Amino acid sequence: MKTIIRYFSFVMGLMLTLPSFAKEKISIMLDWYVNPDHAAIIVAQQKGFFEKNNLEVEIIEPADPALPPKLAAAEKVDLAVSYQPQLYQQVAEGLPLVRVGSLISNPLNSVVVLKKSNLKSLADLKGKKVGYSVSGFEDGLLDTMLHSIGLSNKDVELVNVNWSLSPSLLTGQVDAVIGAFRNFELNQLALEKQEGIAFFPEQYGVPAYDELILVANKNSVTDKKTSAFLTALEQATSYLQAHPNEAWQAFVSYKPNELNTPLNQLAWKDTLPFLANKPRQLDAKRYQQMAEFMQQKGLIPKALALKEYAVEIE
């Protein structure tokens, strides 16, 4: 009888401890549809790195790319993928957001021209048409780049091409585009049998920055859960760097019919070097320099203290 009682006591004790092993649920909304920029997130999901860190992650693709930070601010999702330059503007507008991690720790934005155009330097853009998608930051980016070689935005004709960056170049609608991601648009042009040339903002006076970051509501960010998410991302990134081919297979397995494309295959190789090896790491100096740049360009009223918009979670 004592043996039976001890057995049931053991079983009951085990059952009482089970809830502690329940996975933490966390939701993340991407900035756009799934692509190689999200490699670390998707591979962490497909290879079980989230699961190993006791997380059940819901990955959401937005219907509108403007939604993710707004939904994170409203606590409708736990995390959102956003852009470092936009974070300053969002916080200035009153959104209670804070950067908690990085996905892409290098600028991807660039000015792209076709090689056949014979535009061999930024100086050659004088009097030419430059296409853009998003006014504001891209205007400031281009103006700074042009200032570094003695020109300004007044020396070019800016044309809003919406999101048709590569098509506008290929059709001759514009001579150059700003806002082209160096890991995508150059490959998109190559698939059309055209060679592109890219000019990188960080080489023409623009402070280096993180292209893609993770943001959360500053008043409700759960350090433990977010920390586990960042640990899984770091593990996935290490796996990506060590096993790029296997990681590619894991990536496309998420949505085989949509992700296994020639463009994604090319972009994959060009994206891996830009992945944040230490997603939680915060470079305070770089973030403050970009804040000052945004203020100088009139994109935000003032450069806030770092603690107002970015944290490094242990």
Swiss-Prot record:
One of its GO terms (biological process) is thiamine biosynthetic process. SUPFAM superfamilies: Periplasmic binding protein-like II. It comes from the Bacteria. Pfam families: NMT1. Keywords: Thiamine biosynthesis. Belongs to the NMT1/THI5 family. Probably involved in thiamine biosynthesis. PANTHER family: 4-AMINO-5-HYDROXYMETHYL-2-METHYLPYRIMIDINE PHOSPHATE SYNTHASE THI11-RELATED, THIAMINE BIOSYNTHESIS PROTEIN HI_0357-RELATED. This is Putative thiamine biosynthesis protein HI_0357.
